Amino acid sequence: MTELEKDCLFCKIIRGEIPSYTVFENDDVKAFLDISQVTKGHTLIIPKKHLVNFFDYSQEDAARFLQYIPVIAQAIKKSDPTIKGLNVEVNNGEIAGQVVMHSHIHLIPRRSENDPVSTPHVNNADEYS
């Protein structure tokens, strides 16, 4: 185990050193409720292999990990009929808002237009076109 893995918050959750509310788990991934819920049911999916972010992924890592997004999203939707939509968010690197340096995907259920938004939606079409 590397020093990075030893001190990694999500690696500690995978090893059971830190408790979590697990939604889904198998040999490849663990999904659990985010401690800082943007909305009720906000879930994180993490690979059990320590990868900092998508820049570290091989094609095999991506295939192994990303296939579970729809499985977990469908389970979240099935668990709560009030869910009308779902944001799937990934922050790669500190500059992009990544806080825990272990790759993870946010699944944020949406029930109404009044739900808090974690990513600001700004129209920059004039600036970037």
Residue ranges and their predicted role:
Residues 1-129:
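HIT superfamily nucleotide-processing domains
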